[in-house]
Amino acid sequence: MTLEEEYRLSCYEELTTLGNHNHIYLVKHKLSGEIFVKKVLSRFSLDVYKQLRDLQIPGIPKIHDLILENNSLILIEDYIHGQTLEQLLAEQTTLVYSDALAIMRKLCDVLKSLHTLTPPIIHRDLKLSNIILTSENLVYIVDFD
């Protein structure tokens, strides 16, 4: 890791770990006060993350920084405030048809954006816990690791 990369990482204060993951942290940028997610990945495709960072696809959290350290990738991305589709279905057990259809259409739009890239990006682990719904009715796909 370069001195510049160390400095960039030092600008983030770790607040807490997210969920059961000891490699995903909620962090706060010390200067702006903005909240982000920091992930330390041991298995990753650097090309995929660079492509996601450079393209900023709607429905995918914006990646702000990528830093290689030893055999890990440290990733800083937007924190998406909302609940997973898994959480929503645990609370409601069923969805109104029109709501389910709207979620699926938005999800398909995000997947189409990923799959029509050259080269295409395939998530490979799409599940209810990797789909976040926001209070603004936006759909995000997370966890490309």
Question: Which residues fall in each region the model found?
Answer:
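Protein kinase catalytic-loop region centered on the HRD/HxD motif
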Residues: 109-121
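Activation-segment/catalytic-loop signature of the eukaryotic protein kinase fold
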Residues: 66
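ATP-binding glycine-rich loop module of kinase domains
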Residues: 20-44
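Conserved protein kinase catalytic/activation segment
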Residues: 130-141
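Activation segment signature within eukaryotic-like protein kinase domains
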Residues: 103-104
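Conserved short submotifs of the Hanks-type protein kinase catalytic core
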Residues: 70-84
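AlphaC helix of the protein kinase catalytic domain
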Residues: 85-95
